[in-house]
Every structure is written in C-alpha cells, then in structure tokens.
Design a protein with these regions (language model features):
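C-terminal glycine/acidic-rich active-site capping loop/insertion
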Residues: 31, 62, 186-190, 275-277, ...
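Rossmann-fold dehydrogenase core element
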Residues: 118-135, 155-159
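Beta-loop-alpha module in the N-terminal Rossmann-like domain of NAD(P)-dependent dehydrogenases
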Residues: 60-122
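Predominantly a Rossmann-like dinucleotide-binding segment in NAD(P)-dependent oxidoreductases
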Residues: 19, 138-245, 366
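Contiguous beta-strand/loop segments that form the cofactor/metal-binding neighborhood of enzyme cores
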Residues: 6-7, 211-300, 327-338
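C-terminal helix-rich "cap/oligomerization" subdomain common to oxidoreductases
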Residues: 1-7, 79-81, 117, 333-374
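Hydrophobic residues in well-ordered beta-strands that form the structural core
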Residues: 66, 105, 130-132, 160, ...
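N-terminal Rossmann-like dinucleotide-binding module
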Residues: 1-59
Length: 374
C-alpha cells in the first residue's frame, strides 16, 4: 500500500460514542494523518455510557460533549469515528453523513438491513467516504490474497474459514437453577467490559454470527475478489454459554455459502470457552484452487512467551508484525484523499449483514435461503 502524504494537514476527527471497544478511535489517533478533536454522545444516554465516553476523553485530553448536534456544529472536523452499541451504529453514522463528514465505523454495520440501507443512501447523497472496521490487513490475510491473486493455486474453487474465539461469556450453559431468572443481556455485557468480551453490548441480544461474522465473511469477500454470496444454509445453537441460551442467540454456527462465479464457501464460528483452546482460538483459512490448495493460520506470525509466575489466564501466544489497525487508518486517509477505496465499504458490509440475516433465517427454517444483496 502506498502511504498518504505526511506533509498534508492532519484530518480532525470527532469520536461519536466510544462505549464498546475503543480499538477503533485508538487506531485513528495513532496515525499521523489524524487528530482526535472531541468525544460526543447524547445526554439522554445511560450513565454507564457517559462514564466510558468521559474516561476515553480524559485519557486523550479532549472534551466530552453531551450533545451530538452541538459538537458537530461548533467544531470544524473532517471525519468521525463511530463506536457505540451496534444497534446505534447507523443512527450516529447517518448524522455524520448528513453533516458531510467521512466515517470510519465499528463492526457490525448494523443488525438491520433497513438501517444499513438508510446509511448507504445518506453516504451516497452526501458523497462521503465510509470504512467499516475489519481484519483484512492481517499478515496472514495479505499472504492468502497474494496466493490467490498470483494464481499460485490456480483458479479459486472453494474456501472455508474456522473462526473460533476461545473466550468465556459468563456462566456455562446448564449452570442455572430451576428458579433462576434468565440472564439479562445488557447486564452481562457490562460485566464483560473488563476483559473485552463485550462485543455484543446493547439492549438487543446478539449471537456470534451477528457480532463476529463480519470478520470471516469479509475475508471471504476479499479473497473472492468481491464476489457476492448468493445463497446460504446454516445451523446455529446456544451450546456453551447460559447468557446466549437465555437470550435465544447463537454461540456456535456453521454456514455453507454459494458464491458468485461458481465458488463454494463455508465458515464455522463460535465463542467456545477459554478452556477449549490453548491460544485465543482456532482461526484458519482453507483455500482450494484448480492447481493446488493452502491452509493459512490467521494468527501467524506469532511467538510464544513463558515466564515465572505468569498469570494463568494470560495468553501465551502473541501475534507479531500485525499492522492491521494502522493499515486500516492508512486506507481511510487515502480514501478521504481520493487515492484509494475503503478495503471494506458500507455496501460490502451491508451485504455481509444480509448474509448473516439470511443465515439466521436459514437456521430457523432448516432450509437454504437466498441473500438479499444490494
């Protein structure tokens, strides 16, 4: 990737809520082409959201403004970083688009296709750029894409992605007693913030397909050259965690994909518990071409670290040479400059949302379902 012009004035960025993970605005702040200007959210939000927003603002020594319209009207900025609860992603991004601001937004784009379409219409109407956060610049994904683009394994025929996170999500399934109330989804997500396993934070319960499915589906979208998933067949289950079971969402799923150009694909995804794997989880690509095949571990390159009195829950394996977040920020800057296109734009992320929704419908119906692509 060519670098952006470091001589240009940095873009000023407003942070529209940072109540889930803060990796997105941190990555933007770490890039020399961006400066964070403020954090903002609506004053009507619950207290826990204000506490998280204020904490981030204090760390970066920028103001926290409890009024989005006021923040946008009184501060001259070029772009926004959007990282609230997933159910609010599109609401905040539409406000930014209508203000003529470029957008980098956390995943998933939304849990509703109508919200995705509303955002896309606003982006196209106001001619702004939108990058949806992803992991497509991991070293292993770059290597996999190079193997396909170079025709080293011939024409791409089929690919599979294992995407298992070996993380806990509260009490294990079967641990509740007969008179116990169902676990409240939001309460559980608030508890999970300390260890970063609250990707599904919000009022609406979200299964692993909705929370993390964008990652493997974005891999597949990139590796197939942007081909659309046309039809899916899926199985989903609450297999590991009581909170998922109580809220009728999946923590384990398999999806078979029929993709444009006669390509077949599949993915297996789950939040499978910390005891299930010595590393963060089994995340692997299996790619079959007309002249050969390859298996690529998403975590590589990595090193293993062991030392005396090491905390038992500390991951022993550490990824190295991982510039994914920096390269995403670089891609965003180049896209604003008009020198590049987002590696995952809002239409592609919307179609991934459509694939997830079709998969959930397929699991409910027990039959293949067509994907409603845009």
């Amino acid at each position: 990737m060519k670098t952006t012009d470091r001589e240009q004035k940095p873009f000023s960025v407003g942070v529209l809520s940072v109540v889930k993970h803060d990796y997105l605005p941190r990555a933007i702040a770490a890039h020399p082409r961006f400066n964070l200007s403020f954090v903002t959210d609506e004053i009507s939000r619950p207290q826990w959201t204000h506490e998280r927003n204020q904490k981030f603002a204090d760390e970066f020594e920028i103001p926290y403004i409890k009024d989005i319209d006021k923040a946008l009207s009184e501060n001259k900025i070029d772009a926004v970083a959007v990282s609230p609860e997933a159910e609010r992603h599109c609401d905040l991004a539409v406000i930014a688009a209508e203000a003529g601001l470029h957008i980098v937004i956390d995943k998933p784009l939304s849990t509703k296709l109508t919200e995705c379409d509303r955002l896309i219409d606003a982006i196209e109407r106001n001619k702004v750029t939108c990058l949806v956060w992803n992991r497509n610049y991991l070293p292993s994904l770059i290597q996999a894409n190079n193997k396909i683009q170079s025709k080293e394994i011939g024409k791409l025929l089929s690919l599979h992605c294992d995407f298992y996170f070996s993380k806990d999500a509260g009490p294990p399934i079967g641990s509740s007693k007969p008179n116990d109330l169902p676990i409240n989804w939001l309460d559980r997500q608030l508890e999970a913030h300390a260890d970063g396993s609250d990707g599904g934070v919000g009022q609406k319960a979200m299964g692993e397909l909705e929370v993390e499915g964008i990652y493997p589906l974005a891999y597949i979208q990139m590796l197939t050259g942007g081909a659309k998933v046309e039809r899916v067949f899926a199985r989903t289950k609450s297999h590991f965690h009581q909170a998922h079971h109580d809220n009728d969402v999946d923590d384990l799923a398999t999806v078979t994909l029929e993709i444009e150009g006669g390509i077949t694909g599949s993915l297996s995804i789950g939040r499978i518990g910390a005891a299930s794997h010595p590393d963060i989880g089994e995340i692997k690509l299996h790619i079959i071409g007309s002249k050969g095949s390859t298996v690529i571990s998403e975590a590589r390159p990595e090193v293993s670290i062991y030392y005396r009195d090491q905390p038992p829950l500390e991951f022993k394996n550490r990824r190295i040479a991982d510039d994914n977040n920096y390269l995403l920020a670089e891609n965003f800057a180049r896209s604003i400059d008009g020198q590049d296109s987002p590696v995952l734009d809002c239409i592609e992320a919307r179609n991934i949302c459509a694939t997830v929704q079709a998969s959930l419908e397929s699991s409910r119906l027990g039959k293949p379902v067509d994907v409603k692509n845009r």
